[in-house]
Amino acid sequence: MHAIFSSFSRKVVVNVGASSQSQLTKMVKKKPNQSRHLLPSRLSSPSSVPHFVPSAVSRSAKVHGFFASKLGNTNLKLKFGNVMESRAGFFSSELPSHGFESGGFTGFQKRGWKSWINGANGVVFGLVIANAAVFTMWRVSDRSWMLSTYSFTSGYIHTLITSGFSHIGTSQIILNMIGISYFGSRIARTLGPLYLLKLYFAGALGGSVCFLSYHALLATLKGEGVVIKDHQSTAPISQLLGADGSMFAIALLDMFIYPKVTTYFALMLRVHVMFRIINLGVEILNIPEGGPNHIASSSGQLGGVVVAAMAWARIKKGRF
Protein backbone atom coordinates (compact mmCIF):
# COMPACT_ATOMS: atom_id res chain seq x y z
CA MET A 1 0.00 0.00 0.00
CA HIS A 2 2.77 2.36 0.86
CA ALA A 3 4.56 1.57 -2.40
CA ILE A 4 1.46 2.33 -4.45
CA PHE A 5 0.95 5.69 -2.70
CA SER A 6 4.60 6.72 -3.18
CA SER A 7 4.55 5.90 -6.90
CA PHE A 8 1.32 7.88 -7.34
CA SER A 9 2.80 10.95 -5.58
CA ARG A 10 5.88 10.82 -7.82
CA LYS A 11 3.72 10.87 -10.94
CA VAL A 12 1.75 13.85 -9.64
CA VAL A 13 4.91 15.80 -8.83
CA VAL A 14 6.41 14.98 -12.24
CA ASN A 15 3.21 15.99 -14.01
CA VAL A 16 2.93 19.20 -12.01
CA GLY A 17 6.57 20.06 -12.73
CA ALA A 18 6.15 19.32 -16.41
CA SER A 19 2.98 21.40 -16.65
CA SER A 20 4.52 24.36 -14.80
CA GLN A 21 7.59 24.19 -17.03
CA SER A 22 5.44 24.20 -20.17
CA GLN A 23 3.44 27.18 -18.87
CA LEU A 24 6.59 29.14 -18.17
CA THR A 25 7.88 28.34 -21.65
CA LYS A 26 4.62 29.59 -23.19
CA MET A 27 4.73 32.83 -21.15
CA VAL A 28 8.27 33.54 -22.23
CA LYS A 29 7.41 32.89 -25.88
CA LYS A 30 4.26 35.04 -25.75
CA LYS A 31 5.78 38.10 -23.97
CA PRO A 32 9.43 38.44 -24.86
CA ASN A 33 9.29 42.25 -24.97
CA GLN A 34 7.94 42.48 -21.44
CA SER A 35 10.79 40.46 -20.02
CA ARG A 36 13.31 42.54 -21.90
CA HIS A 37 11.66 45.71 -20.75
CA LEU A 38 12.12 44.73 -17.12
CA LEU A 39 15.86 44.41 -17.59
CA PRO A 40 18.19 47.41 -17.44
CA SER A 41 18.65 49.27 -20.68
CA ARG A 42 22.35 48.44 -20.91
CA LEU A 43 21.85 44.72 -20.13
CA SER A 44 18.57 44.05 -21.87
CA SER A 45 19.82 41.78 -24.63
CA PRO A 46 22.96 40.97 -26.51
CA SER A 47 21.38 42.32 -29.69
CA SER A 48 21.29 45.84 -28.22
CA VAL A 49 25.08 46.03 -28.15
CA PRO A 50 26.28 48.16 -31.13
CA HIS A 51 28.32 46.40 -33.76
CA PHE A 52 30.66 47.93 -36.31
CA VAL A 53 29.27 47.41 -39.81
CA PRO A 54 31.42 48.83 -42.64
CA SER A 55 28.55 48.89 -45.14
CA ALA A 56 26.41 50.95 -42.76
CA VAL A 57 29.21 53.47 -42.31
CA SER A 58 29.67 53.89 -46.04
CA ARG A 59 25.91 54.17 -46.50
CA SER A 60 25.63 56.89 -43.83
CA ALA A 61 28.57 58.75 -45.36
CA LYS A 62 26.85 58.71 -48.73
CA VAL A 63 23.59 59.97 -47.23
CA HIS A 64 25.42 62.67 -45.30
CA GLY A 65 27.30 63.75 -48.41
CA PHE A 66 24.09 63.84 -50.43
CA PHE A 67 22.27 66.09 -47.95
CA ALA A 68 25.35 68.23 -47.37
CA SER A 69 25.72 68.83 -51.11
CA LYS A 70 22.04 69.62 -51.47
CA LEU A 71 22.03 72.01 -48.54
CA GLY A 72 25.25 73.63 -49.71
CA ASN A 73 23.87 74.15 -53.20
CA THR A 74 20.67 75.60 -51.78
CA ASN A 75 22.60 77.98 -49.56
CA LEU A 76 24.80 78.96 -52.49
CA LYS A 77 21.75 79.61 -54.64
CA LEU A 78 20.18 81.74 -51.94
CA LYS A 79 23.35 83.79 -51.51
CA PHE A 80 23.77 84.18 -55.25
CA GLY A 81 20.13 85.19 -55.57
CA ASN A 82 20.54 87.82 -52.88
CA VAL A 83 23.58 89.24 -54.66
CA MET A 84 21.76 89.37 -57.97
CA GLU A 85 18.75 91.01 -56.38
CA SER A 86 20.94 93.64 -54.73
CA ARG A 87 22.67 94.37 -58.03
CA ALA A 88 19.56 94.34 -60.18
CA GLY A 89 17.41 96.19 -57.66
CA PHE A 90 19.01 99.50 -58.64
CA PHE A 91 17.97 99.24 -62.29
CA SER A 92 14.89 96.99 -62.04
CA SER A 93 11.32 98.16 -61.90
CA GLU A 94 10.69 96.58 -58.51
CA LEU A 95 10.84 98.86 -55.53
CA PRO A 96 12.17 98.36 -52.06
CA SER A 97 9.80 96.97 -49.49
CA HIS A 98 9.66 100.17 -47.46
CA GLY A 99 8.34 103.59 -48.16
CA PHE A 100 5.12 105.04 -49.46
CA GLU A 101 4.27 102.20 -51.83
CA SER A 102 5.01 98.95 -50.07
CA GLY A 103 4.51 98.26 -46.40
CA GLY A 104 4.58 101.92 -45.54
CA PHE A 105 1.94 102.02 -42.85
CA THR A 106 3.02 98.76 -41.21
CA GLY A 107 6.56 100.01 -40.73
CA PHE A 108 5.23 103.43 -39.79
CA GLN A 109 3.15 101.96 -36.98
CA LYS A 110 6.13 99.99 -35.66
CA ARG A 111 8.77 102.73 -35.87
CA GLY A 112 6.69 105.81 -35.09
CA TRP A 113 6.79 109.39 -36.29
CA LYS A 114 10.40 110.19 -35.43
CA SER A 115 12.07 107.40 -37.41
CA TRP A 116 9.65 107.86 -40.31
CA ILE A 117 10.45 111.58 -40.60
CA ASN A 118 14.20 110.99 -40.25
CA GLY A 119 14.17 108.41 -43.03
CA ALA A 120 13.87 108.70 -46.80
CA ASN A 121 10.23 109.72 -46.61
CA GLY A 122 11.07 112.50 -44.16
CA VAL A 123 12.88 114.54 -46.83
CA VAL A 124 9.93 114.22 -49.18
CA PHE A 125 7.57 115.18 -46.38
CA GLY A 126 9.71 118.21 -45.53
CA LEU A 127 9.80 119.39 -49.15
CA VAL A 128 6.03 119.12 -49.44
CA ILE A 129 5.52 121.04 -46.17
CA ALA A 130 7.95 123.78 -47.26
CA ASN A 131 6.19 124.23 -50.60
CA ALA A 132 2.80 124.28 -48.90
CA ALA A 133 4.02 126.93 -46.43
CA VAL A 134 5.31 129.21 -49.20
CA PHE A 135 2.10 128.66 -51.15
CA THR A 136 0.13 129.79 -48.08
CA MET A 137 2.31 132.90 -47.85
CA TRP A 138 1.43 133.73 -51.45
CA ARG A 139 -2.24 133.47 -50.50
CA VAL A 140 -1.98 135.53 -47.32
CA SER A 141 0.77 138.10 -47.98
CA ASP A 142 0.85 140.90 -50.53
CA ARG A 143 2.06 139.67 -53.94
CA SER A 144 3.92 142.88 -54.74
CA TRP A 145 5.89 142.52 -51.50
CA MET A 146 6.62 138.87 -52.25
CA LEU A 147 7.89 139.75 -55.73
CA SER A 148 9.84 142.94 -55.09
CA THR A 149 11.40 142.39 -51.68
CA TYR A 150 12.94 138.95 -52.15
CA SER A 151 13.91 138.71 -55.83
CA PHE A 152 17.03 138.24 -57.89
CA THR A 153 16.82 141.78 -59.26
CA SER A 154 17.06 143.11 -55.70
CA GLY A 155 20.40 141.39 -55.21
CA TYR A 156 19.21 138.26 -53.44
CA ILE A 157 21.18 135.49 -55.13
CA HIS A 158 19.60 132.80 -52.98
CA THR A 159 16.29 133.36 -54.74
CA LEU A 160 17.68 131.32 -57.63
CA ILE A 161 17.03 128.31 -55.38
CA THR A 162 14.17 129.51 -53.20
CA SER A 163 12.11 130.23 -56.30
CA GLY A 164 11.74 126.47 -56.55
CA PHE A 165 9.49 126.58 -53.48
CA SER A 166 7.16 129.30 -54.76
CA HIS A 167 3.83 128.26 -56.26
CA ILE A 168 0.92 130.55 -57.00
CA GLY A 169 -1.35 128.32 -59.07
CA THR A 170 -3.22 125.58 -57.24
CA SER A 171 -2.99 123.07 -60.07
CA GLN A 172 0.74 123.69 -60.39
CA ILE A 173 1.54 122.90 -56.78
CA ILE A 174 -0.73 119.85 -56.75
CA LEU A 175 0.91 118.31 -59.82
CA ASN A 176 4.42 119.13 -58.66
CA MET A 177 3.87 117.75 -55.16
CA ILE A 178 2.38 114.53 -56.52
CA GLY A 179 5.39 114.09 -58.79
CA ILE A 180 7.87 114.88 -56.02
CA SER A 181 6.11 112.55 -53.57
CA TYR A 182 6.08 109.62 -55.98
CA PHE A 183 9.39 110.00 -57.81
CA GLY A 184 11.21 111.62 -54.90
CA SER A 185 10.48 108.78 -52.49
CA ARG A 186 11.98 106.30 -54.96
CA ILE A 187 15.08 108.45 -55.49
CA ALA A 188 15.54 108.86 -51.72
CA ARG A 189 15.33 105.11 -51.14
CA THR A 190 17.73 104.37 -54.00
CA LEU A 191 20.35 107.09 -53.67
CA GLY A 192 19.67 108.46 -50.19
CA PRO A 193 17.68 111.37 -48.70
CA LEU A 194 20.63 113.77 -48.93
CA TYR A 195 20.99 113.07 -52.64
CA LEU A 196 17.30 113.85 -53.16
CA LEU A 197 17.71 117.17 -51.36
CA LYS A 198 20.72 118.08 -53.49
CA LEU A 199 18.88 117.07 -56.64
CA TYR A 200 15.91 119.25 -55.68
CA PHE A 201 18.14 122.29 -55.12
CA ALA A 202 20.09 121.58 -58.31
CA GLY A 203 16.85 121.36 -60.30
CA ALA A 204 15.63 124.66 -58.87
CA LEU A 205 18.97 126.31 -59.63
CA GLY A 206 19.05 124.84 -63.13
CA GLY A 207 15.55 126.10 -63.84
CA SER A 208 16.44 129.61 -62.69
CA VAL A 209 19.66 129.64 -64.72
CA CYS A 210 17.81 128.50 -67.85
CA PHE A 211 15.14 131.13 -67.28
CA LEU A 212 17.73 133.91 -66.98
CA SER A 213 19.73 132.54 -69.91
CA TYR A 214 16.64 132.50 -72.10
CA HIS A 215 15.82 136.11 -71.30
CA ALA A 216 19.42 137.11 -71.96
CA LEU A 217 19.26 135.32 -75.32
CA LEU A 218 15.91 136.93 -76.03
CA ALA A 219 17.32 140.41 -75.39
CA THR A 220 20.31 139.68 -77.62
CA LEU A 221 18.14 138.46 -80.51
CA LYS A 222 15.82 141.42 -80.23
CA GLY A 223 18.85 143.73 -80.35
CA GLU A 224 19.81 142.14 -83.66
CA GLY A 225 16.33 142.62 -85.09
CA VAL A 226 15.05 139.06 -84.69
CA VAL A 227 11.37 138.98 -83.79
CA ILE A 228 10.35 136.17 -81.45
CA LYS A 229 6.69 135.65 -80.71
CA ASP A 230 6.70 134.56 -77.11
CA HIS A 231 3.23 134.77 -75.62
CA GLN A 232 4.62 134.91 -72.09
CA SER A 233 7.78 136.95 -72.53
CA THR A 234 6.06 139.98 -71.04
CA ALA A 235 4.15 137.99 -68.44
CA PRO A 236 4.76 138.75 -64.77
CA ILE A 237 7.45 136.72 -63.09
CA SER A 238 4.87 135.29 -60.70
CA GLN A 239 3.66 132.98 -63.47
CA LEU A 240 7.16 131.57 -63.93
CA LEU A 241 7.76 130.45 -60.34
CA GLY A 242 7.41 126.93 -59.04
CA ALA A 243 9.20 123.63 -58.52
CA ASP A 244 8.95 122.62 -62.17
CA GLY A 245 12.72 122.38 -62.54
CA SER A 246 13.12 120.30 -59.39
CA MET A 247 10.20 118.04 -60.23
CA PHE A 248 11.44 117.40 -63.76
CA ALA A 249 14.96 116.66 -62.51
CA ILE A 250 13.65 114.14 -59.98
CA ALA A 251 11.08 112.57 -62.30
CA LEU A 252 13.40 112.22 -65.28
CA LEU A 253 16.22 110.73 -63.19
CA ASP A 254 13.78 108.21 -61.74
CA MET A 255 12.70 107.29 -65.26
CA PHE A 256 16.35 106.74 -66.19
CA ILE A 257 16.96 104.49 -63.18
CA TYR A 258 13.64 102.60 -63.37
CA PRO A 259 12.77 102.40 -67.08
CA LYS A 260 9.99 99.84 -66.57
CA VAL A 261 6.50 100.82 -65.44
CA THR A 262 4.75 98.65 -62.85
CA THR A 263 1.54 100.58 -62.05
CA TYR A 264 -1.03 102.59 -63.96
CA PHE A 265 -0.42 105.55 -61.66
CA ALA A 266 3.26 105.58 -62.61
CA LEU A 267 2.29 105.31 -66.27
CA MET A 268 0.03 108.36 -66.00
CA LEU A 269 2.75 110.43 -64.35
CA ARG A 270 5.38 109.38 -66.87
CA VAL A 271 3.16 110.11 -69.83
CA HIS A 272 2.53 113.59 -68.43
CA VAL A 273 6.25 114.24 -67.95
CA MET A 274 7.21 112.91 -71.37
CA PHE A 275 4.50 114.93 -73.07
CA ARG A 276 5.76 118.12 -71.49
CA ILE A 277 9.35 117.29 -72.44
CA ILE A 278 8.34 116.69 -76.07
CA ASN A 279 6.37 119.94 -76.07
CA LEU A 280 9.42 121.71 -74.68
CA GLY A 281 11.57 120.36 -77.50
CA VAL A 282 9.07 121.55 -80.11
CA GLU A 283 9.05 125.04 -78.60
CA ILE A 284 12.84 125.19 -78.61
CA LEU A 285 12.88 124.27 -82.30
CA ASN A 286 10.42 127.08 -83.02
CA ILE A 287 12.71 129.77 -81.59
CA PRO A 288 15.03 130.18 -84.64
CA GLU A 289 12.03 130.14 -86.97
CA GLY A 290 10.30 132.94 -85.09
CA GLY A 291 7.21 130.85 -84.42
CA PRO A 292 4.98 131.25 -81.37
CA ASN A 293 6.21 129.47 -78.27
CA HIS A 294 5.88 129.40 -74.50
CA ILE A 295 9.53 128.79 -73.78
CA ALA A 296 9.61 131.37 -70.99
CA SER A 297 7.30 129.31 -68.82
CA SER A 298 9.04 126.08 -69.86
CA SER A 299 12.59 127.23 -69.15
CA GLY A 300 12.38 125.84 -65.62
CA GLN A 301 11.47 122.44 -67.03
CA LEU A 302 14.41 122.65 -69.40
CA GLY A 303 16.72 123.27 -66.46
CA GLY A 304 15.37 120.19 -64.71
CA VAL A 305 15.94 118.07 -67.81
CA VAL A 306 19.55 119.24 -68.05
CA VAL A 307 20.18 118.51 -64.36
CA ALA A 308 18.66 115.02 -64.67
CA ALA A 309 20.85 114.24 -67.70
CA MET A 310 23.97 115.38 -65.85
CA ALA A 311 23.05 113.38 -62.75
CA TRP A 312 22.39 110.24 -64.80
CA ALA A 313 25.76 110.60 -66.56
CA ARG A 314 27.51 110.79 -63.19
CA ILE A 315 25.59 107.79 -61.83
CA LYS A 316 26.60 105.67 -64.82
CA LYS A 317 30.22 106.52 -64.06
CA GLY A 318 29.74 105.57 -60.42
CA ARG A 319 29.98 109.12 -59.07
CA PHE A 320 26.86 110.29 -57.28
From Swiss-Prot:
Looking up InterPro entries in the UniProt record yields:
Peptidase_S54_rhomboid_dom, Rhomboid-like_sf, Rhomboid_protease_S54
* Signal peptide extent: none
Among the GO molecular function terms of this UniProt record, one is: serine-type endopeptidase activity
- Asked if the record carries the keyword Transmembrane helix, the reply is yes
> Mind telling me which residue stretches traverse the membrane in this protein?
116-136, 160-180, 199-219, 247-267, 295-315
Subcellular compartments: Plastid, Chloroplast membrane
Asked if the keyword Transcription regulation belongs to this entry, the reply reads no
- Pfam families noted in UniProt: Rhomboid
Alphabetic keyword roster: Chloroplast, Membrane, Plastid, Transit peptide, Transmembrane, Transmembrane helix
Q: What does this protein do?
A: Probable rhomboid-type serine protease that catalyzes intramembrane proteolysis.
Which family is annotated? Belongs to the peptidase S54 family.
Name-wise, this protein is Rhomboid-like protein 17, chloroplastic
State the organism named in the record.
Arabidopsis thaliana (Mouse-ear cress)
Identify the coding gene: RBL17
